[in-house]
């Protein structure tokens, strides 16, 4: 039986495709707008656990690179965990992000062809109303400025920017 886990907090993702990413409207079947997809999926956990281990305060970035449509698989995936995380927290985040303990990444794990490993770096998250930026030391940076909604210019038209539970309920 796998370890029970739950995480909640701020989630951000962005890729190098033109707006709007074709994966979103084609269930990952379209060609990336620049031939390959380079994406960063960021989670800043405010509350969470892996069994009895607290994951509150842990930040991590899942880096994904694909050639061609994401649905075709053979993704290269790497994980960057904040350098303030304990060794046990890094192991737990690795298990969650690999899909080995269920949750959203379990379905995506079949698409991964190459796991590039886990690195540790200082992760800084800057989140404003209509933008975010994340740096993971010298390893990665992810950011976006949202397009204002016509109905409410202070809200984004569309953005994968959530405060939500990442684990299955």
Segments predicted by a language model, with ranges:
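Short amphipathic alpha-helical surface micro-motifs
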Residues: 20-26, 42-43, 58-63, 113-117
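Short, hydrophobic/π-rich interface segment
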Residues: 157-160
């Amino acid at each position: 039986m796998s370890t029970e886990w739950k995480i909640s907090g701020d989630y951000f993702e962005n890729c190098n495709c033109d707006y709007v990413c074709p994966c979103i409207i084609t269930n990952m079947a379209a060609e990336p707008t620049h031939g390959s997809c380079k994406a960063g999926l960021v989670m800043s956990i405010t509350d969470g656990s892996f069994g009895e281990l607290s994951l509150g305060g842990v930040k991590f970035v899942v880096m994904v690179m694909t050639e061609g449509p994401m649905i075709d698989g053979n993704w290269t995936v790497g994980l960057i965990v904040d350098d303030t995380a304990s060794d046990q927290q890094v192991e737990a985040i690795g298990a969650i992000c690999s899909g080995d303990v269920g949750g959203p990444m379990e379905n995506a794990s079949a698409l991964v062809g190459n796991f590039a490993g886990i690195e540790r770096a200082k992760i800084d998250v800057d989140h404003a109303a209509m933008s975010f930026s994340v740096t993971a030391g010298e390893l990665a940076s992810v950011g976006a400025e949202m397009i204002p909604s016509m109905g409410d210019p202070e809200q984004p038209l569309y953005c994968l920017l959530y405060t939500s539970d990442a684990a299955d309920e």
